[in-house]
């Protein structure tokens, strides 16, 4: 599990759910004089034999405790809100002129780019969108990211921060709209 992505938990938080612990031992257990095994009949877990780490950081506690304190309904409600916000952001961005959607929402992420009418795909359009992204992120009120889909530089919106709500999406869309206007009138394209 990677709960930092959809469960709003810190990086490095995680757990591995296994059905058969002997598979972990087959993959990780090593014999060395400086790592003597526990007694075979012991009920103690030999962490050296089930993990590449030689100690236990207990990352699973960082998953279990928030669920114990807040319940699964809280996490489900927040995640549902973020999925809805992604769809909302997608519809708002899709409605903007000279914005081209390159990847529709997958869970909480979608990709788009600025596409002026007189610019065909290629290095020039990629460079233009890199500048577009820099300008959108300049306010430091939100952080859009980038990726390449094939050879095309794209701008991504990923809605996963637990403090992100509709007003933040509205502000982000307004900033994309503002930068689009500046690029369209030539203020930022050179």
Language-model regions, residue ranges each:
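Non-catalytic, mobile gating and regulatory segments of ester bond hydrolases
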Residues: 94, 99-100, 172-175
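Short amphipathic beta-strand starts and helix->beta connectors
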Residues: 95-98, 138-143
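Short beta-strand
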Residues: 100-105, 144-148
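Active-site C-terminal subdomain of aminotransferase-like
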Residues: 1-94
């Amino acid at each position: 599990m990677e709960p930092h992505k959809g469960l709003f938990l810190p990086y490095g938080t995680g757990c591995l759910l296994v059905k058969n612990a002997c598979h972990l031992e087959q993959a990780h257990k090593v014999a060395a004089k400086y790592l003597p095994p526990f007694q075979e009949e012991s009920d103690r877990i030999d962490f050296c034999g089930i993990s590449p780490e030689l100690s236990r950081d207990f990352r699973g506690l960082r998953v279990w405790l928030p669920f114990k304190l807040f319940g699964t309904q809280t996490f489900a409600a927040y995640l549902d809100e973020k999925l809805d916000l992604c769809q909302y952001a997608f519809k708002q961005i899709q409605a903007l002129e000279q914005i081209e959607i390159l990847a529709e929402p997958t869970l909480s992420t979608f990709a788009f780019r600025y596409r002026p009418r007189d610019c065909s795909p290629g290095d020039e359009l990629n460079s233009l969108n890199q500048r577009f992204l820099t300008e959108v992120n300049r306010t430091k009120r939100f952080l859009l990211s980038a990726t390449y889909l094939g050879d095309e530089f794209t701008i991504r919106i990923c809605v996963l921060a637990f403090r992100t709500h509709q007003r933040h999406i509205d502000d982000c869309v307004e900033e994309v709209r503002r930068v689009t206007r500046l690029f369209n009138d030539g203020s930022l394209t050179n």
